[in-house]
Amino acid sequence: KIYELGDELAVVMFGGLNYYTGQLFDMQAITEAGHKVGAKVGFDLAHAAGNVELFLHDWKVDFAAWCTYKYMNSSPGGVAGLFVHENHVSNEELLRLAGWWGHDKERRFLMEPQFKPIHSAESWQLSNAPVLGMAAHLASLDIYDEVGMSAISKKREDLTAYLEFVINEVSNSSAHTNFEIITPKNPKERGSQLSILAHGQLKPLFDILTKEGVI
């Protein structure tokens, strides 16, 4: 579709991992396609950050944003994350919603009339981050640093493969169960999520899980 629209496109904005199906998209291929038609490419990584390995700089993604309260465990209301490729951070003419926390740190408190952006993704910050929320987020990031995304990804693949096996075993064990996993079977095309169609069994299944204390 990107090639079909061609130079009609200015920006390609896409979800890196679909929240409904659990499908992980090939962000590198999407970025390359967008750049070939002259578009900037960005991603909503709300369901990908902390879930799958991301190489935004190497893929030459122009920008991305994500929340941290899901897989990154910073709790509801946790600070958001932002990526801007280094190719763009020195462009002071680039339009942005500018705030004082994105101003050159050396001159921030001089209260000058002109905005002087930091030459990094920091220049897109509007105000200072909430300290207590950042403390919770930092505790989670420390664990990620200690374990590493490669190890997390390997564990994720093992767990989802086992869950996929169990769901299929349960579905095939009785004529009264018919569960369909709509998340891609290829581990490289999904994250930690398996989405299931219950085919008419949703309410009974919901009631059973609720009775057992499953949220």
State what each model feature region is:
Residues 1-215:
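Pyridoxal 5′-phosphate
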